[in-house]
Amino acid sequence: RQPLRILEVGGGTGGTTAWLLPELNGVPALEYHFTDISALFTRRAQQKFADYDFVKYSELDLEKEAQSQGFQAQSYDLIVAANVIHATRHIGRTLDNLRPLLKPGGRLLMREITQPMRLFDFVFGPLVLPLQDLDAREGELFLTTAQWQQQ
């Protein structure tokens, strides 16, 4: 039997991971791959989740092709992306970088803020990388549900 293969992208401090791993613990034939752009976050996650022997850890830059970073096409059943895709320069290209990693019938599970948050944009907007898809974002950092569906 093939293992269920899950890829978490932009895992950061492990908030979503900490919620998911206890639920997945004990699932037979499971591989969970925690990734983040930062080696610091991947090292911290490795320490934090050391009790889960079905987890492996790697760096992954979502803005680059995953295959050029050592990831195989059509190798994951599920990709988990919690509040990370919006933080990339070009959402469409980021999604294009993730799609090839999914097995046929695989799914992308995203959690993103979908309501405009002008105060958040005002405070944190200057800290965000220069965005290249301002037309798609319509001047906001976060996309609405309808805008995500167009991606």
Regions found by a protein language model. Name each.
Residues R1-Q151:
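4′-phosphopantetheine-dependent carrier domains
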